[in-house]
């Protein structure tokens, strides 16, 4: 009879995978992940049938925590697109500063072709209101299929730079985050959006 799975072991594996993917990218070995979690490699495969399954489950878990954080920072009464965008930006940057390992892991995993379309769809469909809000004032070209990935990359590059500088200079972090927001806003949003 198979032993029941332990949530503690699964959580330890997810935490070890987060650190491993943050440090080594998705090339991190399952044996290193298992060793870091304090379990045998075979145990890892009792919880995740393949490395890709581990990668996708971790990606989904981190993204959902991030999006919940971003939604929590929204003011339901705020109707101005720029202020909503500012709240989303501030929540995203604050999350990245507070969770450097998860942020680094998610950035590396997001580039992987091993993250399935189904996993990406689950993230997008989990919080449609956030997705809609983000699109309210974005330049139309960045909503097109041809330039959507480019617009996303611009946002993430500016966010990455802002997180890095805010992390290394906590006394000026608020100013850095505000300047980063203005740079992102001018790059990606329609001039008449307020």
Curated annotation (Swiss-Prot):
Disruption phenotype: Deletion results in a multi-drug resistance phenotype in the KPBj1 M3 Lev strain, with 16-fold decreases in susceptibility to nalidixic acid, chloramphenicol, tetracycline, and cefoxitin. Significant increases in expression of RamA and efflux pump subunit AcrA, in KPBj1 M3 Lev strain. Significant decrease in susceptibility to antimicrobials such as tetracyclines, macrolides, beta-lactams, fluoroquinolones, polymyxin B, colistin, fungicides, toxic anions, and the cathelicidin antimicrobial peptide LL-37 in the Ecl8 strain.
Annotated InterPro entries: DNA-bd_HTH_TetR-type_CS, Homeodomain-like_sf, HTH-type_TetR-like_transc_reg, HTH_TetR
HTH tetR-type domain location: 7-66
Keywords: DNA-binding, Repressor, RNA-binding, Transcription, Transcription regulation
Residue ranges flagged as DNA-binding region: 29-48
Pfam families for this protein: TetR_N
An example molecular function term from Gene Ontology annotations: RNA binding
Effect annotated for changing residue 42 to R: In strain: KpWEA3 clinical isolate, increases expression of transcriptional regulator RamA, efflux pump subunit AcrA and TolC
Keyword Amino-acid biosynthesis listed: no
Role description: Transcriptional regulator. Represses the transcription of the transcriptional activator RamA and, thereby, leads to repression of the expression of the efflux pump subunits AcrA and AcrB, and TolC. Acts by binding directly to the promoter region of the ramA gene. Promoter binding may be inhibited partially by the small regulatory RNA sRamA5, perhaps thereby ensuring a basal level of expression of RamA.
Subunit and interaction comment: Homodimer. May bind DNA either as a homodimer or as a pair of homodimers. Binds small regulatory RNA sRamA5.
Miscellaneous comment: Phenothiazines, including chlorpromazine or thioridazine, abolish binding of RamR to promoter DNA in vitro; thereby probably derepressing RamA.
Protein name: Transcriptional regulator RamR
Species per Swiss-Prot/TrEMBL record: Klebsiella pneumoniae subsp. pneumoniae (strain HS11286)
Taxonomic lineage from the root: Bacteria, Pseudomonadati, Pseudomonadota, Gammaproteobacteria, Enterobacterales
Gene name, Swiss-Prot/TrEMBL: ramR
